[in-house]
């Protein structure tokens, strides 16, 4: 199965030119204005006091720039960035090995921090509060505890599921930042900047055409830019115009809403096979030819967020936006009662 261009999760193509496209300083970072404003104040205050920045949680959907912000914080504080993830830290010793390599003002970035196990979390508590590491040497009656001092560092945790963080861990973060989806204009700025770095000429109209199909996500915007650049180099004299972007993305099967073939197949199944719904998720997965979990976790969230489908107690239903998007006419005049719908019912 080929990798999905409009997924917000990281895929192979994202590693190409990844670091060159990332801003290094906070004033170069586009979007997330409220987060930037707060972090800028906290960073300057920490610098004036000659202290480490307080520990930070960045939470929100994938692909919105959490790792980039962590790198910027490390640069602004004059430290190095060390990156790991919750699933990669299996034992307390794994975390201890990382903590003992840190220097003053370094930033330890833990992606998917909600997936840390509890024994690892317990090592983090004194490290975050008192900058000390308690380790046990030996076993049984002969064991003894040793306390090691750690340099003043900043822990940055990233999560897509803030509610899954344990209360003791969450309470130890002094700065909580909610990452929001980007506007089309912000994504256009990011695309123009990235195109310049990649050495590809792009018009504002071409950048906007890519931006509006990028699902509010910089990772997707840069990914689509790289693919459209290929078309531009071969077919359009290395220039991404509005027309070049539109035709390239049509070939890539990414439509004007940022939907791909499966997104549209889901809408078509609900409307054409079930008269707009309601239809159960198991039945829908069968008609689309995808796993149930894939429908729920990968495709459905964006369709819900954009208002193209709704969840009701009896199943999924297509909205008027979905009918209009597919050029269909709703023959059933009954409207969906929003009071009977919820985004959280299965």
UniProtKB/Swiss-Prot annotation:
Region (Head domain (RuvB-H)): 256-346
EC class: hydrolase
Binding site for ATP: 21-22, 63, 66-68, 129-131, 172, 182, 219
An annotated GO cellular component: cytoplasm
Top-level taxon: Bacteria
Chain spans, region Small ATPAse domain (RuvB-S): 183-253
Pfam families: AAA_lid_4, RuvB_C, RuvB_N
Catalytic activity: ATP + H2O = ADP + phosphate + H(+)
Residues reported in the UniProt entry to bind DNA: 311, 316
A Gene Ontology biological process term: DNA recombination
Documented EC number(s): 3.6.4.-
Presence of the UniProt keyword Hydrolase in the record: yes
Gene Ontology MF term list: ATP binding; ATP hydrolysis activity; four-way junction DNA binding; four-way junction helicase activity
Entry keyword set: ATP-binding, Cytoplasm, DNA damage, DNA recombination, DNA repair, DNA-binding, Hydrolase, Nucleotide-binding
Intrachain S-S bonds: none
Binding site for Mg(2+): 67
Region (Large ATPase domain (RuvB-L)): 1-182
InterPro entries per the UniProt record, alphabetical: AAA+_ATPase (IPR003593), AAA_lid_4 (IPR041445), DNA_helicase_Holl-junc_RuvB (IPR004605), P-loop_NTPase (IPR027417), RuvB-like_N (IPR008824), RuvB_C (IPR008823), WH-like_DNA-bd_sf (IPR036388), WH_DNA-bd_sf (IPR036390)
Signal peptide: none
Function of the protein: The RuvA-RuvB-RuvC complex processes Holliday junction (HJ) DNA during genetic recombination and DNA repair, while the RuvA-RuvB complex plays an important role in the rescue of blocked DNA replication forks via replication fork reversal (RFR). RuvA specifically binds to HJ cruciform DNA, conferring on it an open structure. The RuvB hexamer acts as an ATP-dependent pump, pulling dsDNA into and through the RuvAB complex. RuvB forms 2 homohexamers on either side of HJ DNA bound by 1 or 2 RuvA tetramers; 4 subunits per hexamer contact DNA at a time.
Recorded family membership: Belongs to the RuvB family.
Entry comment, domain topic: Has 3 domains, the large (RuvB-L) and small ATPase (RuvB-S) domains and the C-terminal head (RuvB-H) domain. The head domain binds DNA, while the ATPase domains jointly bind ATP, ADP or are empty depending on the state of the subunit in the translocation cycle. During a single DNA translocation step the structure of each domain remains the same, but their relative positions change.
NCBIfam families linked: PRK00080.1, ruvB
Subunit and partners: Homohexamer. Forms an RuvA(8)-RuvB(12)-Holliday junction (HJ) complex. HJ DNA is sandwiched between 2 RuvA tetramers; dsDNA enters through RuvA and exits via RuvB. An RuvB hexamer assembles on each DNA strand where it exits the tetramer. Each RuvB hexamer is contacted by two RuvA subunits (via domain III) on 2 adjacent RuvB subunits; this complex drives branch migration. In the full resolvosome a probable DNA-RuvA(4)-RuvB(12)-RuvC(2) complex forms which resolves the HJ.
Protein known as: Holliday junction branch migration complex subunit RuvB
Organism for this UniProt entry: Clostridium perfringens (strain ATCC 13124 / DSM 756 / JCM 1290 / NCIMB 6125 / NCTC 8237 / Type A)
GN (gene name): ruvB
């Amino acid at each position: 199965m080929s990798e999905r261009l409009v997924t917000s999760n990281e895929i192979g193509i994202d590693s190409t030119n990844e670091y060159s496209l990332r801003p290094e300083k906070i004033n170069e970072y586009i979007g997330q204005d409220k987060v930037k404003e707060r972090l800028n104040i906290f960073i300057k205050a920490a610098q004036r006091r000659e202290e480490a920045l307080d520990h930070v949680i960045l939470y929100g959907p994938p692909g919105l720039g959490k790792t980039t912000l962590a790198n910027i914080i490390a640069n602004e504080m004059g430290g190095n960035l060390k990156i790991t993830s919750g699933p990669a830290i299996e034992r307390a010793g794994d975390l201890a090995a990382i903590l003992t390599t840190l220097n003053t003002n370094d930033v330890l970035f833990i992606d998917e921090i909600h997936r840390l196990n509890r024994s690892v979390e317990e090592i983090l508590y004194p490290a975050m509060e008192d900058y000390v590491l308690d380790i046990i040497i030996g076993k049984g009656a002969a064991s003894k505890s040793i306390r090691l001092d750690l340099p003043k560092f900043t822990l940055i945790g990233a999560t897509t599921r803030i509610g899954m963080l344990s209360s003791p861990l969450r309470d130890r973060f002094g700065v909580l930042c909610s990452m929001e989806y980007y506007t089309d204009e912000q994504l256009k700025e990011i695309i123009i900047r990235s195109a310049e770095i990649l050495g590809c000429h792009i018009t504002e109209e071409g950048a906007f055409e890519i931006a509006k199909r990028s699902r509010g996500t910089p990772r997707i915007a840069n990914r689509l830019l790289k693919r459209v650049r290929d078309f531009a180099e071969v077919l359009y004299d290395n220039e991404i115009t509005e027309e070049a972007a539109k035709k390239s993305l049509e070939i890539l099967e990414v439509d004007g809403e940022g939907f791909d073939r499966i997104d549209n197949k889901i809408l078509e199944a609900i409307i054409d096979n079930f008269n707009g719904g309601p239809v159960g998720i198991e039945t829908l997965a069968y008609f689309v030819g995808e796993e149930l979990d894939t429908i729920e976790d990968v495709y459905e969230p964006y369709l819900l967020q954009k208002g193209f489908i709704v969840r009701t107690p009896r199943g999924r239903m297509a909205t008027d936006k979905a009918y209009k998007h597919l050029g269909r006419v709703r023959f059933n005049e009954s409207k969906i009662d929003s009071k009977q719908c919820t985004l959280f019912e299965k």
